[in-house]
């Protein structure tokens, strides 16, 4: 039986919120909050993959296993691919990518992503989404939207408002029920993950700054389904960070 591992990619030089992995949340750095949250799962191992010696030192101080990676990776998935190669995971194993800026991610969703990949044998990656309930979120580029087919395979991901409802120009007129927000959690088959870093980086991946588009561009399938539990958006801005701090301080 395949082992299932969690890898948390943690880059220090975030563009929108510098050093956010080390941002204080109720007395602990965010990366520690994420790590402690995922330790509630029952997977075989949990690893932090980082390009920062500072993050490595801090993470090891609270007991995490850490792999130091190069600092020139195109995406978090590329970073995880390097870590997986260094760790020697078997090709049949599954790795779940939990973003280092999601300290409130429900454990049920992590387990769901892994199980979805096990169930969908044609897919090399699985991920989750949830219905958008606020029309403003459709137009927020920080909320990635996704459309998928009747068999629950992703067709496209975008920061734009997809699908486009032709004939409606006013936000109030849009049928919001057909819009889904992508939740940034991925499960990969290790064999594919090792191959991912060798794939062509597509123009659309660069244009949208969405690593999952490399998978679709190269003809592979991403399985997707609605999440078991609602997932708060990740911490991308100072405003996001303040919201999370308030939740931990309640």
Curated annotation (Swiss-Prot):
InterPro entries: Cytidylyl_trans, KdsB, Nucleotide-diphossugar_trans. One of its GO terms (molecular function) is 3-deoxy-manno-octulosonate cytidylyltransferase activity. It catalyses: 3-deoxy-alpha-D-manno-oct-2-ulosonate + CTP = CMP-3-deoxy-beta-D-manno-octulosonate + diphosphate. Its main location: cytoplasm. Pfam families: CTP_transf_3. One of its GO terms (biological process) is lipopolysaccharide biosynthetic process. Its EC number is 2.7.7.38. One of its GO terms (cellular component) is cytosol. It comes from the Bacteria. Keywords: Cytoplasm, Lipopolysaccharide biosynthesis, Nucleotidyltransferase, Transferase. Pathway: Nucleotide-sugar biosynthesis; CMP-3-deoxy-D-manno-octulosonate biosynthesis; CMP-3-deoxy-D-manno-octulosonate from 3-deoxy-D-manno-octulosonate and CTP: step 1/1; Bacterial outer membrane biogenesis; lipopolysaccharide biosynthesis. It is found in: Cytoplasm. Activates KDO (a required 8-carbon sugar) for incorporation into bacterial lipopolysaccharide in Gram-negative bacteria. PANTHER family: 3-DEOXY-MANNO-OCTULOSONATE CYTIDYLYLTRANSFERASE, 3-DEOXY-MANNO-OCTULOSONATE CYTIDYLYLTRANSFERASE, MITOCHONDRIAL. Belongs to the KdsB family. This is 3-deoxy-manno-octulosonate cytidylyltransferase. The gene is kdsB.
């Amino acid at each position: 039986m395949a082992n299932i591992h969690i890898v948390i990619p943690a880059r220090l030089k975030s563009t929108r919120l510098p050093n956010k992995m080390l941002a204080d949340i109720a007395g602990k750095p965010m990366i520690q909050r994420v790590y402690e949250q995922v330790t509630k799962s029952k997977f075989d191992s949990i690893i932090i993959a980082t390009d920062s010696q500072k993050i490595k030192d801090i993470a090891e101080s609270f007991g995490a296993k850490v792999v130091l990676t190069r600092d020139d990776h195109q995406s978090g998935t590329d970073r995880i691919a390097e870590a997986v190669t260094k760790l020697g995971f078997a090709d049949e194993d599954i790795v779940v990518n939990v973003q280092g800026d999601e300290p409130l991610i429900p454990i049920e969703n992590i387990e769901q992503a892994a199980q979805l990949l096990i169930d969908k044998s044609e897919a090399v990656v699985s991920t989750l989404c949830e219905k958008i309930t606020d029309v403003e979120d459709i137009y927020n580029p920080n909320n990635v939207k996704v459309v998928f087919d009747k068999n629950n395979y992703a067709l496209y991901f975008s920061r734009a408002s997809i699908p486009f409802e032709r004939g409606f120009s006013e936000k109030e007129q849009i049928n919001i029920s057909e819009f889904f927000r992508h939740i940034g959690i991925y499960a990969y088959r290790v064999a594919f993950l090792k191959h991912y870093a060798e794939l062509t980086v597509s123009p659309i991946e660069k244009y949208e700054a969405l690593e999952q588009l490399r998978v679709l561009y190269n003809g592979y399938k991403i399985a997707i389904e609605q999440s078991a539990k609602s997932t708060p958006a990740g911490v991308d801005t100072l405003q996001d960070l303040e919201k999370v701090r308030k939740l931990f301080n309640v």
